[in-house]
């Protein structure tokens, strides 16, 4: 399928640089294929769903994946910016570095400065391997929980490029870029649809008889990458690690058997649930990597409703929502959102999507 079909123009002023406060005051666009759109607030969510429905959120926790350091040794010590993108093992990470041309295999990086070091001193890493487009493998001097703490001490929130290019991350982002469900560390980007939830909204959902179930998918930096191929068949999807517990799978299967719906909060929950489901729609316990790439024509097995933010043009995420509710439906919904001043991307507003009848398995 041609990727230019998923392109659209977005005025820069539509990009949210800060989240709504309080979080559940964000706007919510209800999208029903073949019915139309309605303007709501996230606080209206309980009334837009039914008793017995089950909401599924991602409880991954964003790490402070943005590191600033310098190459040590040699005749100069150039400044290097590093974004951690995927853990390899207890001491090694895949990362994106800038400027990559300043680094070679075997170089050593030192993070922090005289006024900012972790408790154990300097955090060093060697460049173990160098790939394309600024990607490297870094082997850190620390291991396991000690390394995790050092990264937390020295790192900053890894804001998406469309925010970071317009302002620097600050202390407010430490809390803003984390969902209330965040528990299991490992993401380098937030599961942003979950940012809209508050304890008050959670209580209102419970009072309506709507459950909230949890899974974990560690969101990678690939979520921000545009699709550069001219055809979706030629795009290589990034891989992310996730897990669906036996308890969550059982609860969701029982709910659907009784007529309840599975409501995926965000593309990460959606992709993991679809990866865990059998062809007949039974959700199985799952632990491992998923590189599922969902485009129009995909038959959804596990998810009936989706809550998600507004996505970048020509992104795998816009392709996913187009597969779920229909490309024409989503193009019309996004045009409405732009005209009505909805806020886009990670800190922006949300939409509640119902599945196109033709997208069911």
From Swiss-Prot:
Record's keyword terms, sorted: Cytoplasm, Queuosine biosynthesis, S-adenosyl-L-methionine, Transferase
This protein's record includes keyword Cytoplasm: yes
GO CC annotation, single: cytoplasm
Subcellular location: Cytoplasm
InterPro entries hit by this protein: QueA (IPR003699), QueA_dom1 (IPR042118), QueA_dom2 (IPR042119), QueA_sf (IPR036100)
EC number assigned by the record: 2.4.99.17
Gene3D superfamilies in UniProt: QueA-like
Transmembrane feature ranges: none
PANTHER family listed in its UniProt record: S-ADENOSYLMETHIONINE:TRNA RIBOSYLTRANSFERASE-ISOMERASE
Family membership noted in the UniProt record: Belongs to the QueA family.
Protein name per its UniProtKB record: S-adenosylmethionine:tRNA ribosyltransferase-isomerase
Species annotation: Afipia carboxidovorans (strain ATCC 49405 / DSM 1227 / KCTC 32145 / OM5)
Gene of this entry: queA
């Amino acid at each position: 399928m041609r990727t230019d079909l998923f392109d659209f123009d977005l005025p820069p002023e539509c990009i949210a640089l800060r989240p709504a406060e309080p979080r559940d005051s964000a706007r919510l666009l209800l999208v029903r294929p073949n019915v139309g759109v309605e303007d709501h607030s996230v606080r209206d969510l309980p009334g837009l769903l039914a008793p017995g429905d089950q909401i599924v959120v991602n409880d991954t926790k964003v790490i402070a994946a943005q590191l600033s350091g310098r190459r040590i040794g040699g005749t100069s010590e150039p400044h290097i910016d590093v974004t951690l993108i995927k853990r390899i093992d207890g001491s090694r990470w895949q990362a994106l570095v800038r400027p990559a041309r300043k680094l070679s295999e075997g170089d050593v990086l030192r993070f922090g400065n005289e006024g900012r070091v972790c408790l154990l001193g300097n955090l060093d890493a060697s460049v173990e391997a160098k790939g394309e487009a600024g990607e490297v493998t870094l082997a850190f001097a620390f291991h396991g929980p000690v390394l995790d703490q050092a990264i937390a001490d020295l790192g900053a929130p890894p804001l998406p490029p469309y925010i970071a290019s317009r302002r620097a991350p600050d202390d407010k982002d430490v809390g803003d870029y984390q969902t209330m469900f965040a528990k299991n560390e490992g993401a380098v980007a937030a599961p942003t649809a979950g940012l809209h939830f508050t304890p008050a909204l959670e209580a209102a959902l419970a009072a309506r008889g709507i459950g909230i179930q949890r899974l974990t998918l560690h969101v990678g930096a690939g979520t921000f990458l545009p699709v550069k191929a001219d055809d979706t068949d030629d795009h290589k999807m990034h891989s992310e690690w996730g897990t669906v517990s036996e308890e969550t799978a059982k609860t969701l299967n029982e709910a659907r058997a009784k007529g309840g719906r599975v409501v995926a909060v965000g593309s990460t929950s959606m992709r993991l649930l679809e990866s865990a489901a059998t062809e007949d729609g039974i959700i199985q316990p799952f632990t491992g990597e998923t590189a599922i790439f969902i485009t129009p024509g995909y038959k959804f097995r596990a998810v009936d409703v989706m809550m998600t933010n507004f996505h970048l043009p020509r992104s795998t995420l816009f392709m996913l929502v187009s597969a779920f509710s229909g490309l024409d439906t989503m193009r019309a919904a996004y045009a409405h959102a732009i005209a009505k001043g909805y806020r886009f991307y990670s800190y922006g507003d949300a939409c509640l999507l119902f599945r196109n009848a033709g997208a069911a398995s």
